[in-house]
Amino acid sequence: MSGFSLESEFYCCKCGTKGIPIARKKGKAREAGHLKKLYCLKCGEETNHAECKEFTHYNKADFEFERQYGNFDENQNRILDYGLFRNKMHNEGVDLPWARRNYL
């Protein structure tokens, strides 16, 4: 299985548009939520894109939540680590999209 690869979806942290998916060899995979500089076709520039993987601790719903509540700065970098951001939102009484997955 040396050729086995996993595909990740990437979403632009500036505009939220889905970017081009990237296949990575299993041993070279990054954690879900990883930020990668990619060219965004909608923005017309290189921006940070969040790596989303279904059935992990960070998928599209988590990205949209993080973007909606402003955890990315003007350079599309995270203001708070995602775990800290998630706990902050929970403590503020915000309805978390992953609560149904029992992560808290």
Write out the residue ranges for each language-model feature:
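Short linker/helix segments within small regulatory modules
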Residues: 25-37
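Cys/His-rich microdomains that often coordinate metals
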Residues: 17-19, 47
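Intrinsically disordered, low-complexity glycine/proline-rich and charged
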Residues: 42-47, 52
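Short cysteine-rich clusters marking metal-coordination/redox-active sites
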Residues: 12-15, 40-43
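Short metal-coordination and nucleic-acid-contact micro-motifs, chiefly zinc-binding Cys/His arrays
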Residues: 5-11, 33-36
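Short, intrinsically disordered terminal segments enriched in charged and Pro/Gly residues
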Residues: 1-9, 27, 50-104
